[in-house]
Amino acid sequence: MKLLAATVLLLTICSLEGALVRRQAKEPCVESLVSQYFQTVTDYGKDLMEKVKSPELQAEAKSYFEKSKEQLTPLIKKAGTELVNFLSYFVELGTQPATQ
């Protein structure tokens, strides 16, 4: 009986010490996590800026924008003329009853 009581007492003390150690363990601080996140973002930004500075990437971007401009210019002109026609239709519609 004494052996059983001693065993239970020993197990209880060990589990309490384990809980105490867990409570005393340093948890990761929110500030350090945020700081680490911003440091990672800053590093990625620096890497991206180095990649953007390469002349071949700049030439590729320039050709892409020129190609896009060539394709979009006729569409924008067409949309502009259709908008003017649409608005002039309503202007004419509004002036017709006044003249009759």
Swiss-Prot record:
Coiled coil: none
GO cellular component: blood microparticle; chylomicron; cytosol; early endosome; endoplasmic reticulum lumen; extracellular exosome; extracellular region; extracellular space
An individual GO BP term: reverse cholesterol transport
Residues the record lists as Phosphoserine modifications: 54, 68
Homology family: Belongs to the apolipoprotein A2 family.
Functional description taken from the UniProt entry: May stabilize HDL (high density lipoprotein) structure by its association with lipids, and affect the HDL metabolism.
Protein name: Apolipoprotein A-II
Provenance organism: Homo sapiens (Human)
